[in-house]
Amino acid sequence: MMNERLILVTNDDGYDSRGIAAAIEVARRFGRVVVVAPETTQSGMSQAITMNTPLFLRRVRSEEGLDVYAFSGTPVDCVKMAFDYLLRGKRVDLVLSGINHGSNSAVNVLYSGTMGAAIEGSFYGCPAVGLSLTDYSADADFDAAALYGERILRRLLEGGVQPPLCLNVNVPVGRPEELRGIRLCRQNRGFWREEFYRHEDPRGREYFWLTGDFVNQEPEAEDTDEWALAHGYVSVVPVQTCLLYTSPSP
């Protein structure tokens, strides 16, 4: 039965972000939802864990079919707290991480707290989805990400996929009717060329802001996530956790 499913929702933007509110509404269509998300923004934390400081958990919302917890740790800490404490001994049917406020395509998957949490969820033997919207603006429209996220979750939950499976899903900017569909892709081979901007505070101490530009090393490769997003498609990249090197295909 659909209402017997248990969905874990998390993110890296914080428990009170607009993206996770949209993700919760999507997840609630498939069953009971437990949210364990960071107390504060944890973007770029990848799979960092907290080892040398205590962690604090508080329940911020509870109603039929939904419990929301704020946790003082990283996104991966949140997943561990859910599986190893709050939901210990229970079967989790799917982990949804997001909806992230910004792209996690290409090499960003390695830096992303959103994807770090999704990958961690797959370690526990259930399907996991990292869902991101490629829009950083404060008034970002999450409708398309929610719509396509629901379609992908339905396929995972009802299609009999073999877990563990982790998907990196990125949704381009646009209304749902403007997008061209879903493309199964590989990760683009690109990188960030960073630059540090040096400044001084009023006390004369120097500080730095990190910025940079993404370098797409294969802009014409039509099988990559970057190409799909640039052409109005939702990109879906299956993510493996084994980092063993294999020769790239030509």
Where do the language-model regions lie?
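A cross-family phosphate/adenosyl-ligand binding-site feature
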Residues: 3, 7, 21-85
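Structural motif
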Residues: 6, 93-94
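Glycine-rich phosphate-binding loop signature in dinucleotide/nucleotide-binding domains
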Residues: 86-91
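Glycine/threonine-rich flexible loop motifs
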Residues: 103-112
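Glycine-rich phosphate/pyrophosphate-binding loops
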Residues: 122-145
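Active-site rim beta-loop-alpha module in soluble metabolic enzymes
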Residues: 133-136, 146, 155-202
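A conserved acidic, glycine/proline-rich C-terminal tail/linker
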Residues: 200-226
